[in-house]
């Protein structure tokens, strides 16, 4: 009889805990998504805007895929004007500037991607910060 009570207690615990953890994860995703959407809405009003040698030309969030994407174009450089190691160096900088954010440095599933293009609009680099990149 004692073992049956123990099994029932374990089943109740598992039955309650698993859905509850899914609810917490779901609520966290909803909070992050809402915050990202609000930020995108505000920043979109400013686009295009200058950011040093670049112009920010796009920002979006995909809550289903959990990705915040920004896009910028260099004001002067064409694709061939960028150094060969630009992708590698820019990835290091992107990681450094975004991995202090708990949304990306913990296992939330969220990532931030930036597309860097030359002045003609050709892709030069695609950089990402997420839990796996921030854990390297």
Predicted regions and their residues:
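Immediate post-signal-peptide N-terminus of mature secreted/exported proteins
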Residues: 26-38
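Short, intrinsically disordered, charge-biased short linear motifs at domain edges
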Residues: 18, 82-89, 118-124
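Short, non-transmembrane amphipathic alpha-helical segments
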Residues: 81-105
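Bacterial N-terminal signal peptides
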Residues: 8-19
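Positively charged n-region of N-terminal signal peptides that target proteins for export
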Residues: 1-6
